[in-house]
């Protein structure tokens, strides 16, 4: 999947659900709080410096950005960069637009095959992170959490963050969530967890290929 993601390019930007492209390829959504490192993670995963852009004013970007991956003539999937959330200075109208846009997209988009949820490893599972899970979990599709910026933690702090997040996800399973809920440590700066994330994304987009390679998938 590393080579597949490295063939990523900008496809389109939409600001309303009615403008979502009528594509047939599977989609993988990337979501996370403002300043959780979402754009940086997408760029590192795709081995590009400026594919995804972070807004100069965190939380102000309210668009959905699509990136196609695979051969340009026959893309095999789309990466979907969702607006960042949780920034205190965002006006109320923008917050309402964000909530409608994301909740409806996550709950109803048939092409969506999984959600990559970025959480700052220093403060995982905020209220808004949980809201994202609760919007998407009823679909039964998988959610994989990247605990970003783990290079800022000590080894023990990283272990604690992973355990705390896993425990929080286990609580959703206990409540009857059927989709897979997995988590890993990730650092764009140190490239920690890059291969693990690539393998998991490939298992979503091309499960038969992943099975043949017997790629490990995060638990």
UniProtKB/Swiss-Prot annotation:
Named cofactor requirement(s): Mg(2+)
Residues where GTP binds: 32-39, 59-63, 81-84, 148-151, 186-188
Domain of life: Bacteria
Gene Ontology annotations for the cellular component aspect, listed alphabetically: cytosol
Record carries keyword Transit peptide: no
Residues at which Mg(2+) binds: 39, 61
Gene Ontology molecular function: GTP binding; metal ion binding
Start and end residues of each EngB-type G domain: 24-207
InterPro entries cross-referenced by the UniProt entry: G_ENGB_dom, GTP-bd, GTP-bd_ribosome_bio_YsxC, P-loop_NTPase
SUPFAM superfamilies: P-loop containing nucleoside triphosphate hydrolases
GO biological processes: division septum assembly
Transmembrane segments annotated in the record for this chain: none
Protein keywords: Cell cycle, Cell division, GTP-binding, Magnesium, Metal-binding, Nucleotide-binding, Septation
NCBIfam families: GTPase_YsxC
Record's function text: Necessary for normal cell division and for the maintenance of normal septation.
Record-stated family: Belongs to the TRAFAC class TrmE-Era-EngA-EngB-Septin-like GTPase superfamily. EngB GTPase family.
Name of the protein in its database record: Probable GTP-binding protein EngB
Organism this protein belongs to: Burkholderia multivorans (strain ATCC 17616 / 249)
Taxonomic lineage of the native organism: Bacteria, Pseudomonadati, Pseudomonadota, Betaproteobacteria, Burkholderiales
């Amino acid at each position: 999947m590393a080579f597949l993601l490295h063939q990523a390019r900008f496809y389109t930007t939409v600001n309303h659900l009615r403008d979502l492209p009528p594509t047939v390829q599977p989609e993988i959504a990337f979501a996370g709080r403002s300043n959780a490192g979402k754009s940086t993670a997408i760029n590192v995963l795709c081995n590009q410096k400026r594919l995804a852009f972070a807004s100069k004013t965190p939380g102000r970007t309210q668009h959905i950005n699509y990136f196609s991956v695979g051969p340009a003539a026959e893309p095999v999937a789309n990466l979907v960069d969702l607006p960042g959330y949780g920034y205190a200075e965002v006006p109320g109208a923008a917050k309402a637009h964000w909530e409608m846009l994301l909740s409806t997209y996550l709950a109803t988009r048939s092409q969506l095959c999984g959600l990559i949820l970025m959480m700052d490893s220093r403060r995982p599972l905020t209220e808004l992170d949980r809201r994202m899970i609760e919007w998407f979990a009823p679909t039964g599709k998988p959610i994989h959490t990247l605990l970003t910026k783990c290079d800022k933690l000590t080894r023990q702090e990283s272990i604690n963050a992973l355990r705390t997040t896993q425990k929080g996800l286990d609580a959703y399973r206990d409540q009857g969530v059927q989709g897979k809920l997995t988590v890993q440590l990730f650092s764009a700066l140190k490239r920690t967890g890059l291969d693990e994330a690539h393998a998991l994304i490939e298992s979503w987009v091309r499960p038969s290929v992943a099975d043949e390679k017997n790629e490990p998938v995060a638990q």
